[in-house]
């Protein structure tokens, strides 16, 4: 893991037969490094795959200088067919800053609101303005100079960053449509044949984990690095 990494977050997507997760490292100026993209397969109605996910989230990652870091914050999507199980899993791990999220579309929806416990499990649930977050992810992907907000990805496929990953990461684009006589911006798939977009969503969730936890030491004094809006 590169020495510039100071803080690790994780984004987790829940599918019917697997979890997909990405560990992202963050440095000064919110420069980021893709650390690992992982698929964890199993029957989500049984406990083993949840235990496997917990093991993955408990992994420590070693930097080149020997320093070990653990995942300090994670956001897990509660959409799909297992919302109660996701919220319960996260509730039991809130002390590890593992949070359940629920996406809400719309360009005017704030990226993050304060969590609620208005659910059957009584666990914290963050409503995530996913379109706002996608704007931030895309803005960072467009940064071409290494430094603040730049995104690094490892060479080779050993860490899960294969051709399919980058197809998913870039599967969507922002378009403008007319609705009711006014312009409306929305995110759509570029190619209907490329329907998988989990990598884009998961990088969004890992970014949300960073913003919710708001760790010190990543900002550059006097420089505005904010690409997103956090609602109180």
What residues fall within each predicted segment?
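C-terminal nuclease/phosphodiesterase catalytic domains that cleave nucleic-acid phosphodiester bonds
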Residues: 79-227
């Amino acid at each position: 893991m590169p020495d510039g990494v100071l803080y690790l977050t994780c984004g987790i997507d829940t599918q019917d037969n697997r979890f997909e997760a990405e560990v992202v490292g963050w440095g000064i100026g919110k420069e980021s490094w893709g650390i690992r993209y992982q698929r964890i397969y199993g029957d989500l109605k049984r406990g083993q795959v949840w235990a496997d996910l917990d093991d993955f989230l408990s992994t420590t990652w070693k930097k080149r200088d020997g320093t070990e870091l653990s995942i300090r914050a994670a956001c897990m999507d509660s959409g799909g067919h297992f919302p109660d199980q996701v919220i319960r899993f996260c509730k039991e791990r809130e002390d590890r800053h593992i949070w359940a999220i629920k996406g809400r579309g719309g360009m005017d929806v704030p990226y993050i609101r304060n969590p609620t416990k208005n659910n059957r499990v009584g666990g914290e649930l963050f409503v995530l303005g996913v379109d706002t977050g996608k704007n931030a992810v895309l803005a960072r992907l467009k940064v071409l100079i290494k430094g603040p907000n730049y995104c690094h990805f490892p060479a080779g496929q050993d860490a899960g960053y294969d051709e399919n990953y980058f197809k998913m990461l870039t599967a969507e684009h922002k378009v403008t449509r007319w609705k009711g006589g006014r312009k409306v911006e929305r995110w759509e798939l570029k190619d209907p044949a490329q329907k998988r977009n989990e990598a884009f969503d998961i990088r969004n969730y890992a970014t949300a984990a960073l913003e919710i936890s708001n760790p010190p030491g990543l900002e550059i004094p006097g420089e505005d690095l904010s690409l997103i809006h956090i609602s109180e």
